[in-house]
Amino acid sequence: YGFWSPWGTAALPVVNVPGGAITLTAEGGIEAALSWTPGSFDYYLVYRNGVAIAKVTEPSHTDAASIGGVRYQVRGCYDNSDNYSLSEAVEITVGTDNVRLYDMERGEWLHFLYDSSAHRSTGLSLSQDIQYVQLSGHTYPVAERSEFKSRALRIACVCADDAERQSLRALLGHLTCCKTPEGNMIIGYPASITENSDDFFSTYSFTIEQIDRKEEINIDS
């Protein structure tokens, strides 16, 4: 037999002693260019919309994988202490006037202004997996909606010289970020590229499908 005391309560104070102030500056455009005042910190955590996306040691970071209105913050941290400093949040808009492709493995932007037609056409496909089951006692099928979705961009562009052709062909099988003027962004792999050439230029078409990509980093690693 044993006797148990009532549950007790204890206050566990958590005290943060911040270091120097961090002043964050962010510039929008095709990508987000971040810079901040350096301090005596060992490393910095970069947050986009509340999610830690990068751990860096230099007082700057470029985020190519964002679109639209974005909110950034930077946290200065120490290796041997849990103390930190947090910058004020900065909001910017990231976008593009033309279809832009970013080779995330080579760190290179590709800029294609032209299409084979007078007006560029870019196709966006969205789908949600819905299964229909015919059950006894129901006149119409019952819909079962799963969590699976797909999102893909169909891109067509023109290359007028060999350097552009080689850059585009090099995207095959590379993790690629595609942004459009309509505010769409897809990150995935071009699995196939179709090329048609004449005496003047080469026309390329391909599809990039959104992959399940975890951006949040492990801040303890």
Report residues per predicted region.
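Short beta-strand segments within Ig-like beta-sandwich modules, predominantly Fibronectin type-III
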Residues: 51-58
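Exposed aromatic-hydrophobic patches
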Residues: 60-66, 156-157
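Extracellular/virion structural assembly segments
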Residues: 90-221
